[in-house]
Amino acid sequence: ECCNPACGRHYSCGK
């Protein structure tokens, strides 16, 4: 999980 917009397409906060 990544809650940082820098993760780009890997962004998945709470999913």
Swiss-Prot record:
Disulfide bonds: C2-C7, C3-C13
UniProt-recorded name of the protein: Alpha-conotoxin GIA
Broad class of where this protein is predominantly found: secreted
Keyword Lipid biosynthesis set for record: no
Molecular functions per Gene Ontology: acetylcholine receptor inhibitor activity; ion channel regulator activity; toxin activity
Function: Alpha-conotoxins act on postsynaptic membranes, they bind to the nicotinic acetylcholine receptors (nAChR) and thus inhibit them.
Similarity annotation: Belongs to the conotoxin A superfamily.
Modified residues (Lysine amide): K15
Tissue: Expressed by the venom duct.
Domain characteristics, as noted in the entry: The cysteine framework is I (CC-C-C). Alpha3/5 pattern.
Keywords: Acetylcholine receptor inhibiting toxin, Amidation, Disulfide bond, Ion channel impairing toxin, Neurotoxin, Postsynaptic neurotoxin, Secreted, Toxin
Organism encoding this protein: Conus geographus
Signal peptide range in chain numbering: none
Superkingdom of the source species: Eukaryota
GO cellular component, one term: extracellular region
Compartments it resides in: Secreted
